[in-house]
Amino acid sequence: MSWTSDKRFVFFIFFSLGSLYPCLSNAIDRTQIAVIVNTRDRLSVEIGQYYAKQRRIPFQNFIEVHFSPSGSTLTIKEFGAIKASVDEQTMPGVQAYALTWAAPYRVDCMSITSAFAFGFDPAFCAVGCKPTRRSPYYNSRARLPFTQLGIRPTMAIAATSFEQAKALIDRGVDSDGSIPTGTAYLLSTSDNTRNVRSASYPLVERILNGRLHVRRQNANSLANANDVLFYFIGKAHVEGLETLHFVPGAIADHLTSTGGMLTDDSGQMSALRWLEAGATGSYGTVIEPCNLVQKFPNPVVAIGRYLLGETLIETYWKSVQMPGQGIFIGEPLAAPYLRPYQR
């Protein structure tokens, strides 16, 4: 099923947004997310401690694991031991996880965020240009993903320095309930292979007209914009990021093969560059996915659900139909459109 043929979700977003920002049942909150730190990685510990303090995470939701942080990929066996330890320490009410490192970002053929969410499962992998198992959380109205669906969506607070991590966390906290008036930039590029999401852009404009400023543009990059709230593009490298100002809570990603290889030189831009430029959330695949749109964020879902008051981790996870090969990075609890009474 193509994105634009998902009539059920289109009607849900259209009518929900008719009241602008309706009061949904509570989004995932600080009591329902567990922070996972690697005690053998000093930066991970620093990030985890700062995040727990800023978000007032309950002490029982602070989970410690112990493994060498030297590599980009965990073996299935290594991950199995880590996951068993995490499961043992996870409180029953926890609905989501926040990782506190940029590497490792992969478990064999899965991204590390999907491996923590689903458990390692080769059905979420693919050899060649093939689809993978779909996520039951895609387009879901579930408010308690573990209780209702048996999965804990996971996002990495990814950074290569504490200063970068601190700035990211602060942006997420600052975004809460800010109801920003930024712009959604939807770029159609000359890279036909990576421009496959552009078919959904007219639908974004049609649904969100009058509720958010949407700017569709035929260009290979965006420059000198000071109100970036969403930025979706298909390119291996994205130029001009240093000229942009991202609104706190901003989501930005580029559809390409290896944007999720966060700390390695893959010949393509790492999704970390978005966070370093000021975005609060991004996404990239850790292994060749081919250009199946279902393996990348759907702009209609991502923008629509964010405007409905969902957190970044809920919004982004619900926007990817086949997330097995993709890593979600950012500040999980950022919620620019969540009214205070919705917490």
Give, region by region, the residue ranges found by the protein language model.
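N-terminal signal peptide c-region/cleavage motif recognized by signal peptidases
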Residues: 20-22
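Cysteine-dependent hydrolase recognition
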Residues: 27-343
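Sec-dependent N-terminal signal peptides
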Residues: 9-18
